[in-house]
A protein has these predicted regions:
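A short, structured beta-strand/loop element
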Residues: 85-87
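Short, hydrophobic-biased segments on the C-terminal half of alpha helices
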Residues: 47-51
Length: 88
């Protein structure tokens, strides 16, 4: 996969997904952002970041009942390795 740059906010959302170690819903992501990083972003703002991350290939989503869950497609180690290769 070619390197895709993340914004600081997108990277923060990905950190929540990576730290959780499981698929997250929007509500779970909101709670982690608030509890771990002090970000009290609105639901639509986080939804937009999640959509951008899907478009960039970092996440996929699936639906269970009425809830969408977000699954990481790129792990933290792969992301960091690609950042390092880009830097060098």
């Amino acid at each position: 996969m070619s390197y895709v740059k993340l914004t600081d906010c997108e990277e923060l959302v990905m950190k929540c997904v990576w730290d959780a170690g499981k698929d997250l819903s929007l509500v779970e992501t909101m709670a982690l952002l608030k509890d771990n990083y002090g970000k009290n972003w609105k639901r639509q703002t986080i939804s937009t970041f999640l959509l951008h991350l899907i478009q960039k290939g970092f996440l996929t989503s699936y639906r269970v009942g009425r809830v969408f869950y977000y699954h990481q497609e790129i792990d933290l180690e792969s992301f960091r390795r690609q950042q390092t290769e880009d830097f060098l």
